Amino acid sequence: AMRALGATLVEHGDDFQAALGHAQVLAAAGGLHAMPSFAPELVLGVAVSALAFLREAPPLDTVFVPIGLGSGICAMLAARAALGLRTRIVGVVSAAAPAYARSLAAGHPVSVPATTRLADGLACSTPHPTALAAIAAGVERIVEVTDEEVAAAMRAFFHDTHNVAEGAAAAGLAAV
């Protein structure tokens, strides 16, 4: 679809971090601006959706938020704080890409291989330090889900709601 719209699509590496590193090299070589996957502007934009979700939902005890590089969960943490809510936020990572879970336990960024094949939006091998600090300050805990659990959640979404969810989007349901 991206090529059909005229984009040049470059695929590189085995995980998100490898692709990101290559994109940064290409941007620098071409004099292009590369929007980082974790940036304050991006977190603010995502927080608009998180604010709308938390305002429109009935009072929630807990929200399960998938963690890729961290912008989504940081946005949810910011929205919760802005609204003064007590909602617990639980981060969800792939058991095959547990960098944020390992880093939270260690108290500092820990790099681990990201080998998930189903939830590629969770395929983070090295946490962003700013995201990790925000997560550590506000998350209830981080849980790990297997690709099999994600696949079951994807099937449940399709069977129960007639919607197709990609792996990272189904991770929150897989964690419940």
What do the PLM-derived regions correspond to, one by one?
Residues 1-176:
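PLP-dependent amino-acid enzyme catalytic core
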